[in-house]
């Protein structure tokens, strides 16, 4: 429940504001926002099933939740929008690297974000392959055949860079707040198997 509350209290409102602020004036940032939105929210629907997605901030529709099928279809639509926006921007501004100073996930190139979108599309297609194989096949091929490609090498990954001094917030929770504990399940496993790790 905490994950869902956190998402709707802090993350989704920022995404919503970013979409509205960039839609007509900053197409590349709009595309990146869409990708991050899908990346963040697909985990939420996989945990909870139906979620408020298309009707977020729409009081007129009473914030009606979408079915998981509707959410996944919207994910693919939003990745379409992201790829179109980024591709158009890259083709019109091939030397642009204005985002590189702020990109702490990838290498600062807009083309890498298109790769991310394509790879994410393939991942989501695999998630629905057992229940909607035809849709999954279409979406998988869409990502695979995009001219900008997909992540193939181990070095091509989305990870938070610590070069600018950014540190993992779990370090703050553990070292400063002193609120990170072993779970009861983990303790039972270590104790049950009489593993020496329990004494470290």
Model region roles, listed by residue range:
Residues 3-198:
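Structured, solvent-exposed acidic/aromatic patches
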């Amino acid at each position: 429940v905490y994950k869902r509350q956190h998402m709707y209290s802090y993350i989704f409102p920022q995404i919503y504001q970013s979409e509205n602020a960039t839609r007509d004036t900053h197409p590349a940032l709009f595309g990146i926002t869409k990708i991050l939105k899908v990346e963040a929210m697909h985990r939420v629907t996989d945990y909870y099933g139906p979620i408020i997605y298309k009707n977020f901030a729409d009081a007129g529709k009473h914030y009606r939740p979408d079915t998981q099928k509707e959410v996944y279809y919207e994910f693919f639509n939003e990745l379409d929008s992201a790829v179109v926006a980024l591709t158009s921007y890259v083709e019109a501004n091939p030397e642009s690297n204005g985002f590189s100073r702020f990109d702490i996930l990838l290498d600062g190139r807009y083309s890498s974000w298109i790769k991310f979108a394509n790879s994410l599309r393939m991942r989501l297609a695999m998630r629905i392959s057992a229940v909607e194989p035809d849709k999954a096949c279409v979406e998988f091929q869409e990502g695979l055949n995009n001219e900008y490609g997909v992540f193939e090498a181990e070095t091509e990954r989305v990870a938070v860079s610590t070069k600018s001094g950014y540190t993992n917030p779990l370090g703050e929770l553990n070292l400063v707040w002193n609120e990170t504990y072993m779970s009861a399940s983990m303790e039972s496993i270590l104790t049950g198997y009489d593993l020496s790790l329990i004494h470290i």
